């Protein structure tokens, strides 16, 4: 796997893990995309590059 592909995969995993943690602690409705991005140490724009909307994180969870 190329370095960029590896970094992209790791970033997506980091966003996903941060979202799951926030959903558990705060609830889905109370969690914003901005909070997920901050917890994952990425910009809000980067979050939306990986997930077009917050619900897409849950769809990703369902596919795993």
Model-found features: residue ranges?
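Short hydrophobic/aromatic patch on the recognition helix
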Residues: 42-51
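Alpha-helical DNA-contacting segments of helix-turn-helix folds
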Residues: 51, 55-64
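Basic, helix-initiating cap at the start of DNA-binding domains
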Residues: 1-26, 30-42, 56-59
